[in-house]
Amino acid sequence: QGEAVQDKAEGSVYSTGNTGSGTVGSNTGNSKTEENITDNSPPSSEGLKYETIATANGSYIKIVGYEGHSANVLVPAFIHDIPVTYIAGGAFKNNDVIRTITFEGADDLSKRQFYLPASSNCAPAVFYNLPNLTKITFPYELSCGRYLADYSLYSYNESWRYLFEGTPKLAAIETTSKPSKADTASRRYAYMTSKDGVLYSSYLDGLYFYPYAKKDKSFTVPYETLYVFINDCFYLEELRINATPSHYFDFNILPSNTHLKKVIAEGGKPFETRYWTDGDVLFSRQESTTANPKAVSVAYYPQTKNDKAYRLPDIPEGYYYNIINQFNLNTYIEELYVPARAKVWAGMTEKSYRPPNLRAIHLQEGNPMSQSDIDDFTRHGVNIDYNY
């Protein structure tokens, strides 16, 4: 039955349900060739390592490792009637046998929650160096704790990405069937759900993780989604969004994503809808009716766009380009042509905020760039003239 410890008991899960102390078996077998692996074998829990943690509010189990040899791993919701609540960093690592990992869902949400350590401080990643992993199925009660419950989602893209480091074949993340809205209303932004293999918050408000190996070249963001996090996707070339969403999108597209060629605002009309696409550049318009003139921003400039020069489109009276700073990921652009009704962000003088090969900004007469900003750009090797 395993060695009794007052605060913590270690063990390994077997398909028979037996437990034992310490590590059972060895890591031999983690380097099996693909020819020797049966991908359609039934999911197995054999080889899971866990810790039982006793607290004042009851006991819970944390998965800390895996030493089995199954292509399809099953993590149960309960072990000996104790809820499996946490999974530790490095729980699944350095294993080229695993093809799928399924986390069993609980029938009653009141009996357990399930947490992933969504933090880059977690070392190593939860799913680390699993070169043949293709799919993960999470329980609907998956959460990342209070941080996701407070709607402060923007900074967590890196955290989600970090969870799956070294999983180049990961093509789908799924979730088990979700409870009724009545069960989840108080934690709307804490739970996760999946759609077409993509991981979202429970009501599709935020797109958290788009799998690296999902093979669609074009993907349409659901209308409900307002937070879009795109990682290093190998196949995705085109992202489609609604031109008139209820709120502005928060885009977080990683610099290392070298395949995404454009973000298309479907139904977009320049200066009429909230978003529109001109060529392969995405623009957004400020909705406020009190702003005069109204601000327009470059919302996304593809780092794959290989033009050496870019001229901002003419802008009608009553509008102006505000804070032009979306070009810093592009290594091709050398010259920018900026109309009079535009503000060039002075922060672009800093190396990390400007295109690395930018050498000239050509202003239209009447542009409000100050002499001190012109001097800063010049000092950093960017020539400013009025040859628009």
Roles of regions detected by a PLM:
Residues 65:
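Charge-lined substrate channels and their catalytic hotspots, especially those that engage the 3′ end
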Residues 1-2, 6, 88, 292:
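Short, intrinsically disordered, low-complexity terminal segments
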Residues 47-59, 68-86, 95-121, 128-158, ...:
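Structural signature of tandem-repeat unit edges
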